[in-house]
Amino acid sequence: MDELESIKKRRATEHHQGDVRKACERAGVSATVFQSALRKTKIDDLTDKEMKVLLTFREILDARIAEKEMLKKLL
């Protein structure tokens, strides 16, 4: 599975309300750019802005997972 498909799958299973908005704000793009990126089938087809917002979105999801793991260790 390539990185683009992985992000699409994670969006369907892991994201919380506000994650897309937060990623768009951090990347400095509109939600339309995010939606456009999800419609692409190959990672090579992504523009720089689309790539940036998807990577930012992935970072948000990864940070949440890391935070949950840290809390589990503390408890």
Model-predicted regions and their roles:
Residues 45-67:
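Short Lys/Arg-enriched helix C-cap and helix-to-coil transition segments
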Residues 22-24:
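Short alpha-helical "recognition helix" segments of helix-turn-helix
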Residues 1-17:
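Short, amphipathic alpha-helical "recognition" segments used to contact nucleic acids or chromatin
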Residues 66-75:
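Helix-turn-helix/homeodomain-like alpha-helical modules used for DNA recognition
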Residues 30-45:
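Recognition helix of helix-turn-helix/homeodomain-like DNA-binding domains
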Residues 15, 40-44, 58:
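Short linear motifs centered on Gly/Pro in flexible linkers and helix caps
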